[in-house]
Amino acid sequence: MSASKQTILSVEHLKKYFQTASGQLHAVDDINFTLAKGETLGVVGESGCGKSTLGRTILRLHEPTDGKVIFDGKDVTACSKQEMKKLREDMQIIFQDPFASINPRMTVSQTIAEPLLIQGKYKPSDKEALNRHVRQVMDRVGLAQRLVNAYPHELDGGRRQRIGIGRALALEPKFIVCDEPVSALDVSIQAQILNLMQDIQEEMGLTYLFITHDLSVVKHLSNQIMVMYLGQCIEKAESSELFKNPKHPYTQALLDAIPVADLDSRHTER
């Protein structure tokens, strides 16, 4: 990492173990990395490799078993409950399934407004200012103003995920864990959401931890990519370098799994 880049996140020997009927599950096992402000670290691996648990442990949605998370100079792992509430203004998450992570009884405006009310940014009586803020967020994530009173079941997957992104952006955070935010969407919608997230990152100077099982998703989005397998980091490199020269056989297997349109071959077969 260049000396001119400011480190916003440092993860040191982070571990998260779960006790199961068959013994101890090492979901996250001694993970180390640093992330510069405004950059994206892609975390890639198959289902069950520990990548989502890593993201949630960094945010202390899971309590770490051991290790440290330093965010913007603060030791997240040592913060009190009250300190964590304040810190959550700067550390947010976008979940994989917008239908499961959004309250079906809340409208678009209520969902985006909820974190603002919880953090005391507005009082319920400040309706005009709160509504103005919500509408600004809706504009930022590409949600039409006519949807302000719509419910999740009335919207398609792409719009529901825009609500989830809007909710994460409402408090204007510095860092967002993006937990497979496009895996539940159609390919055409995936591209729209990825472009939106890139635009928002540039506009707001955001830092992303982007979790996915698909290397092709993070190829152009990430500055660095970390490959996880069975809770461990088996390879980490600059994005371009990892695609050109993978060091680990598992990384090569993930690259081989990316579909390639071989038009010449198809024409030859005809």
Model-found features: residue ranges?
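Conserved ABC transporter NBD signature motif
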Residues: 67-75, 87
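Conserved ABC ATPase "signature" region
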Residues: 75, 117, 128-146, 255-256
